[in-house]
Regions:
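Long, contiguous C-terminal modules that act as interaction/assembly or targeting platforms
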Residues: 1, 21-23
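C-terminal motif of bacterial Sec signal peptides marking the signal peptidase cleavage site
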Residues: 16-19
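Positively charged n-region of N-terminal signal peptides that target proteins for export
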Residues: 1-11
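Active-site- and interface-proximal helix/loop "cap" or "latch" segments in soluble metabolic
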Residues: 24-341
């Protein structure tokens, strides 16, 4: 009898421990983009977009952070454009980016590659709030605004961090952040996919445009490989060019930031249900739809061509109000899920 009681008590303890291990907590996923066209000059059109994804706990502190930069450049000499040009982000370039050993901003002899320095910053902001990230002190070194804190410098991040800070703060303060519950073992990924396909060359009569558009995605992936939360956004900066080079650059905000100003609502009824929502609403519907799916399942979402747009086939997604083209959305969210670490 004593043996049976002992076994039962042991079993209860194991069940209790398992229950504790499986306890879920409340989190939020936020996405932020800081974009500049300021480096465009003469025959070079350039867009620098820093994207950050953060997971916040219930107290607003960063639990995980991921950062990348889409630094897209195009030679526009003579007003020409390359619509087939492909782009890699700085994280994707890795050691190919070529920063290691170039500039010793803080004089310690340690000059790491861009991705290593970005990883150090990601780790540094864990446990901080948006206000604390915003308040990170910087100093000028070799024309760069680098950290003052020795903890960050000694971790190997001695490059300029102001765009990192801005993107992370935007992600923390994301008004469209999505809530989710999770236990242990989840990972976070961020991705950016760019195209120049809609660029136009300058002619003798009219300016052209170097349109380096980018889709951004963030995904939280559970231990089972399924998406727990996702977000996406997009930027469409337009850089006017002539035969003499860059004329002017125009960028206001991301599509999510523009909200109703983007002006998609009521324009195209792709699936004939008379529901024509704004871009940010359709984006949110897509993000909600992919929860519970794997990266492969998102990448494999079936599409159909309607009004020259590749829209969803799935009636649940269409009924949720997402009837716009989803090829860019599914590609970048799937990539973010694959990049989760």
């Amino acid at each position: 009898m004593k043996k049976i009681i002992a076994i039962m008590l042991a079993a209860c303890c194991l069940l209790s421990l398992a229950a504790c291990g499986a306890k879920e907590a409340d989190y939020k996923l936020g996405l932020g983009v800081e974009l500049s066209t300021a480096s465009s000059a003469e025959n070079n059109a350039q867009v620098d977009a820093t994207v950050a994804a953060v997971i916040l706990d219930a107290s607003g502190k960063i639990v995980q952070c991921r950062i990348d930069v889409a630094q897209n450049k195009m030679d526009v000499t003579g007003g020409a454009v390359d619509t087939a040009k492909t782009f890699k982000t700085k994280m994707e370039l890795g050691s190919e980016y070529g920063m290691a050993g170039i500039i010793d901003n803080n004089g310690d002899g340690v000059m790491k590659e861009w991705n290593e320095q970005a990883n150090a910053f990601e780790a540094y902001v864990v446990g901080k709030t948006a206000a604390e990230v915003k308040a990170i002190e910087t100093q000028e070194a070799n024309g760069h605004q680098i950290a003052v804190d020795e903890a960050l410098l000694s971790a190997g991040c001695s490059m300029q961090i102001t765009d990192f800070m801005a993107a992370v703060v935007k992600a923390c303060e994301d008004k469209a952040a999505v809530a989710f519950k999770a236990g242990e073992g989840f990972k976070l990924g961020v991705a950016a996919i760019s195209t120049a396909a809609e660029s136009t060359a300058a002619t003798a009569d009219a300016n052209g445009s170097a349109n380096m558009y980018t889709d951004y995605g963030a995904a939280v992936v559970g231990a089972d490989g399924k998406i727990l939360a996702a977000l996406n956004d997009a930027t469409q900066p337009k850089i006017a060019i002539s035969a003499a080079g860059v004329v002017e650059a125009d960028f206001k905000a991301t599509k999510r930031e523009l909200g109703s100003e983007y002006g998609m609502a009521g324009i195209i009824d792709n699936n004939g249900d008379s529901v024509m929502k704004e871009w940010y609403e359709q984006s949110a519907a897509f993000s909600a739809f992919v929860v519970g799916k794997t990266a492969a399942e998102v990448a494999g979402l079936e599409t159909q061509e309607v009004n020259a747009h590749h829209i969803a086939v799935d009636e649940d997604l269409l009924a949720a109000g997402c009837s716009m083209q989803i090829t860019g959305l599914k590609a970048v969210v799937a990539q973010a899920a694959n990049y989760a670490r």
